[in-house]
Amino acid sequence: MKIIVLVLLILGCSQLINSQEVPSDSILFQQFINWMDNYGIFYTSGDMQSKFKSWKSNVLEIASLNSNLNVPDVLYTVTETPVSNLRTLLDAEPTIVESYPGQDIQQFEVNQFSDLTASEFSNIYAGADASLAISEVAASTLSTGAIVGIAVGGSVALIGATAATVLIVKKKRQNKKPQVSEPIATTQDVKMKPTNGIDLLNRTENQHRSITARAFYS
C-alpha cells in the first residue's frame, strides 16, 4: 500500500518564489533528510553538502515550474518501507500527478533522481562524456541543469532529454552483444567394408541344432 504525502515545502516554495523569498537552509535541509529516508538514499559525510546543494536547486526549480500552473499543492507517492538504494532508469518513467481529480493538471515532482545534475545523470546512466557540455535544450529547461522529478506532461524539452537518455543506453547495450562465429561445415570420407550380403535365414556354418527343439509333422 502506498502513502500519499503532501509536500507543504514545495507549496511554500511556490508561493515564496513569487514574492522573491526562499525558505531557510535549515528548513530545506530537514526536508532533504526526509526525502533521503523516503527513498532509502545514503551519503558519506563528504558528499552530504554537495548533494544537498543539488537537491535544493532542483526543489526550487520544481517550485518555480509549478508556480506557473497556479495550483496550491503538490503530491508525491512513497512506499511504506524504504526502497532499494539501487536506482534504475525505470524509475525515470513519467508519472502524472493530479492535485484535484476534477482538474486535468499535471505537475512536476521530486523523485529519487532529484539529487543529481543533468551531467551526473548522463554520466551515470547514459555513459556520456563528462567533458561535453550539457545540451542547450536541457539547460534551457532547467536553469540549474538538474534532473527534477520526471512527473511531467507539460515540458516537451525535458521529456525529449529523458527520451534521448534512454536511446543512448539502448544503443550502447546493443553494441555490447557478443559476436557468435558461424559454424564451419566439414566433410569426412567414410570407408565401406566389403560384405557378402545379409543372411536372412541366419544359416551360419556352425549353427547349433538342438534335438529336443525339433518337431515332426506328418
UniProtKB/Swiss-Prot annotation:
All ranges on the Extracellular side of the membrane: 20-146
Keyword Transmembrane helix in annotation: yes
Signal peptide (UniProt feature, chain positions): 1-19
Keyword Hydrolase found: no
TM region positions: 147-167
Superkingdom of origin: Eukaryota
Name of the protein described by the UniProt record: Uncharacterized protein DDB_G0286021
